[in-house]
Each structure stands twice: as structure tokens, then as C-alpha cells.
Amino acid sequence: MDDPVADQPDGTDETPDGDTAGSSPIGLADAQARAREAVAELLEHPFDGIITAESGADGGWRILAEVVERSAVPDTQDIIGRYEITLDDGGRVTGYELRERYRRGEMKEEL
């Protein structure tokens, strides 16, 4: 049986529908969903929102997400953590880092 992804004479690997094998970068909605899943799995804090989502030249993503690290009453005293989550072009998490921690009620400039 022939392999549907075969080396072509021009040196590229193409599937019969013309897609290059292994190149299926994820879109914005998928990147946001995967970052949200990563927050739940890795940080164990309630997800609060996504602040930024930027695609890189390599097809990967940089997502800045907020989580509630400590709930308080009133909620303006909640402690919010901003985490940068990096994804490769396939949507796999390649790293995360705490970028900032603040009280919800503080006025913040966006990063």
C-alpha cells in the first residue's frame, strides 16, 4: 500500500490534498482553548481570562492568562496572577511563567 505522505520529487512531503505533512498550525481559538486547559492542569487555580494571544514567527503562540490565586470578599481584593503560556505550532505547552501578581481592584496597564 502506498504511503499517502510520500517524498515528492521536489523534496517536499505533501499529502494528496496538497497539505505539507506535519504543518498544521493551530488557530487562535484552539490556542486559547489549549492555554485554558493548561491553566487548569498546571496551575490548579480558577481561570479568570485571557489578556493577550499572539502568534509567533515559528507558528507557536504566546498567551497571557489570568487566574484567581486567592479569592477574597470583596472580590476587588482577589489576588490575580498573570501567567504567560507558550505553545508550539501544534498546540503543545512548551512553558509557562508567572509574569505578575496583583489585587483585582488595582488599576493595571496592560503588558
Curated annotation (Swiss-Prot):
This is Gas vesicle protein O2. Forms homodimers, forms a GvpN-GvpO heterodimer, interacts with GvpC, GvpF, GvpI and GvpL, might interact with GvpA. It comes from Halobacterium salinarum (strain ATCC 700922 / JCM 11081 / NRC-1) (Halobacterium halobium). GO terms for biological process: gas vesicle organization. Residues 1-31 are annotated as: Disordered. Encoded in a 14-gene locus called c-vac which produces cylindrical gas vesicles only in the stationary growth phase. Residues 18-31 have a biased composition (Low complexity). GO terms for cellular component: cytoplasm; gas vesicle. Pfam families: GvpO.
